[in-house]
Regions:
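Glycine-/acidic-rich phosphate or pyrophosphate-binding loops and their flanking alpha/beta elements
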Residues: 13-16, 248-272, 285
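Peripheral docking tails and interdomain loops at the edges
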Residues: 328-400
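Short helix-loop-beta junction
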Residues: 46-51, 249, 286-300, 349-350
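Conserved thiamine diphosphate
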Residues: 123-167, 171-174, 353-368
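Glycine-rich beta-alpha junction loops
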Residues: 114-115, 172-179, 199, 278, ...
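Conformationally flexible catalytic loops at phosphate/diphosphate-handling active centers
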Residues: 167-263
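Thiamine diphosphate
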Residues: 1-131, 136-137, 153-154, 173, ...
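Redox- and metal-dependent alpha/beta enzyme cores, enriched for Fe-S-associated oxidoreductases
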Residues: 264-296, 309-316
Length: 400
């Protein structure tokens, strides 16, 4: 179905939504190596090129490290680039992954998230993307197929901004989103061209025969190396406010608003808030609606931008709450908790008094469903904590 401005409404899987976003963003070079559950994204892009719909160079690397290394060269030469991967593929490209961030290359990568080995399991999880969150890439986590498409388009606008120039991950759960079909509105090409036009005009250093230069040469220990890291951190910090502006502009053009770094859902007057990240958010929103209808003052906050961590937005959103229940689909081993819960502690200590009670709920590991009954238990437990009752700080929902 076609709507205004050349937009189309289709039912498609998350991987196809990612491919459609890349098609609309017009990259110069695409380099993907097949790995479940990402493979169909790369296949779709190859078909777009073969059918003449996309004017881009498609490479056929022998592995993930090479796939990203090819894009490093293309990006250094000034090209717009894209890749996608999952799980062990992401681990295999770790060397190139670090090189990309350190060189401030605006490469966009989709991660169809999957559990890492061992034990082996080709199932949904967030652990693969979570493990590289300290590598210097900006990271976004999507709730739906529509958000995958929109986030990739916005990622190019952010990554290629002359004040940012950092690589961006768009992360979404494998299987639950990569192979799950949903209604998706595809923007018109002219709309996307207008939205991305500022990114295409951004100034950055490029490899050029007329003006030869060296990228990533050996750096003598001392002030120069420190300056590299300082400027990277400064750009990371700027990305938070810059993305708020990009999200606002995207909303004005395309009519879809995501809230910037976080989405606040019925949380303004809530006593209890649950914090989610990824595909389980839709289920959690439905439970919040049900509890609201029953008279409970409960809300939800969805983490969209994990890196850089949205400290300022979370401080404002969580201030004055009585209890917070964080649902994590990942594990932070040394903390015996989830990563989002652990990150959130640095925010909570700056709130109050009183500081909200914070609880962690590990769920959905190994591709298991996060069902409404689990979310109801999160809310009930958080309410008990808000009333001063003794509850466990961390609960593994599938085991306890």
């Amino acid at each position: 179905m076609e709507t205004k401005e050349g937009r189309q409404v289709r039912v498609m899987e998350g991987n196809m939504a990612a491919a459609q976003a890349v098609l609309l963003s017009k990259p110069d070079v695409i380099s993907c190596f097949p790995i479940t559950p990402q493979t169909s994204c790369g296949e779709a892009l190859s078909k777009f090129v073969a059918d003449g719909l996309l004017d881009a160079d498609i490479t056929e690397p022998e592995g993930e490290n090479t796939a990203l290394s090819i894009l490093i060269g293309a990006s250094m030469a000034g090209g717009r680039t894209f890749t996608s991967t999952s799980s062990q593929g992401l681990s295999f490209m770790y060397d190139a992954y670090l090189f990309t961030a350190g060189n401030r290359l605006p490469i966009v990568m989709a991660i169809a998230m999957r559990e890492q080995v061992s034990p082996h399991g080709v199932v949904a999880g967030q652990q693969d993307a979570i493990l590289v969150k300290a590598a210097g890439w900006i990271q976004f986590y999507a709730e739906s197929c529509q958000e995958i498409l929109d986030s990739i388009i916005m990622a190019y606008r952010l990554a290629e901004d002359s004040e940012i120039l950092l690589p961006v991950n768009i992360c979404y759960e494998g299987f639950y989103l990569s192979y799950h079909s949903q209604r998706v509105e595809i923007p018109g090409q002219e709309e996307v061209d207008r939205f991305l036009a500022p990114a295409g005009k951004a100034e950055r250093l490029k490899l050029c025969l007329e003006n030869p230069m060296t990228f990533s040469s050996y750096t003598v220990p001392g002030e120069l190396y420190t300056e590299y890291r300082f400027k990277h951190c400064a750009a990371f910090h700027r990305a938070k406010q810059k993305y708020e502006q990009i999200d606002e502009e995207f909303s004005n053009i395309f009519g879809r608003r995501y809230g910037g770094q976080i989405e606040e859902y019925r949380s303004d007057d809530a006593d209890v808030v649950i914090v989610t990240m990824g595909s389980c958010t839709g289920t959690a929103k439905a439970v919040v609606d049900k509890k609201r209808d029953a008279g409970l003052k409960v809300g939800l906050i969805k983490i969209r931008m994990l890196r850089p961590f949205p400290v300022e937005r979370l401080k404002k959103a969580l201030n004055g709450k009585k209890a917070i229940g964080v649902i994590d689909r990942n594990v932070f081993y040394s903390g015996f908790c989830g990563h989002v819960f652990f990150e959130l502690q640095s925010v909570l200590k700056e709130l109050g008094p009183p500081i909200p009670v914070s609880l962690n709920f590990i769920a959905g590991l190994g591709g298991t469903d996060i069902v409404p009954q689990m979310v109801e238990r999160v809310i009930e437990t958080a309410y008990s904590a808000a009333e001063g009752k003794a509850v466990k700080p961390v609960t593994w929902l599938s085991l306890e």
